[in-house]
């Protein structure tokens, strides 16, 4: 196990986390799935009765109308993702990660098994025991998954891909670490995942002979943007603390092509900040556009 932290000087800006309504009802692509037998694959069924949504016909512009449970997608004022522009410099509460190598479990999960070419994601389920601490708040890693292209922008710039590491506190509050990917050198930390991407949607692969350390997927610098937002998929529940790493990490053009080979575009457009505080470490103060 490795401990990595970002120390906060005197001025710490804790975030008041609001409990998410039904965090367990996040997109199936963001649900921890039951384990498959070692070395095997198995189908993963969508939740019974879950409203269909996707990134095309029933895409982001319609999510708020598809179900009363999705109302926040259309009416919420603290939604994610956002364009990370105009951040105020700040000394932030300590961020500490405690991740360790874990057996590889990869899910290529479609929202609805009976609909072809709908939105989906590639997800890695955590084995348990991995945590982050934000100030004095402790969150357990549930899973991490990928979006392409990125959901968050930085000063108007989109990135080829983005990873979300979803964490949950004992009281149900959520914190998500966002990692932006730019095209460049091959990323060896991705290879165990990329080499075992399930070719079929709705399938989980359990590969106990391979391990992945989520810490290796994060940038060396832990400087971040932070703001209060929401889930980026229905039900778009608010009260999620977002910690988006300022430094992107790389993946090669070949790695990006492999991801896109199994992952259709699954990014929600950026949402209005609506006056929410957006803070960041290690920046000069900028003026919002």
Question: Predicted segment positions?
Answer:
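Alpha-carbonic anhydrase
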Residues: 2-5, 20-289
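Bacterial N-terminal signal peptides
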Residues: 8-16
């Amino acid at each position: 196990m490795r401990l990595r932290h970002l120390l906060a000087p005197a001025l710490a800006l804790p975030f008041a986390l609001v409990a998410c309504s039904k965090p367990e009802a996040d997109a199936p692509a963001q649900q921890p799935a039951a384990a498959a037998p070692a070395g095997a694959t198995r189908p993963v069924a969508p939740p019974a009765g879950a409203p269909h949504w996707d990134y095309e016909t029933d895409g982001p512009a319609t999510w708020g109308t598809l179900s009363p449970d999705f109302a926040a997608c259309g009416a919420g004022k603290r939604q994610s993702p956002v364009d990370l522009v105009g951040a105020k410099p700040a000394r932030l509460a300590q961020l500490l990660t405690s991740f360790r190598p874990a057996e590889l479990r990869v899910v290529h999960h479609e929202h609805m098994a009976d609909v072809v070419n709908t939105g989906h994601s590639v997800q890695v389920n955590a084995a348990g025991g991995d945590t982050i601490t934000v100030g004095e708040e402790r969150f357990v890693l549930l899973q991490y998954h990928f979006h392409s292209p990125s959901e968050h922008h930085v000063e108007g710039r989109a990135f080829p891909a983005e990873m979300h590491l979803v964490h949950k506190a004992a009281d149900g509050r959520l914190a998500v670490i966002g990692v932006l990917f730019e095209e460049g050198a091959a990323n060896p930390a991705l290879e165990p995942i990329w080499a075992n991407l399930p070719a079929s949607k709705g399938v989980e692969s359990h590969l106990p002979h391979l391990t992945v350390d989520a810490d290796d997927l994060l940038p060396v610098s832990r400087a971040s943007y932070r703001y209060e937002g929401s889930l980026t998929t229905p039900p778009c529940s608010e009260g999620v603390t977002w910690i988006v790493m300022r430094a992107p990490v790389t993946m090669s053009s070949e790695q990006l092509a492999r991801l896109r080979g199994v992952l259709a575009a699954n990014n929600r457009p950026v949402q209005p900040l609506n006056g929410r505080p957006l803070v960041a470490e290690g920046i000069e103060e900028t003026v919002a556009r």
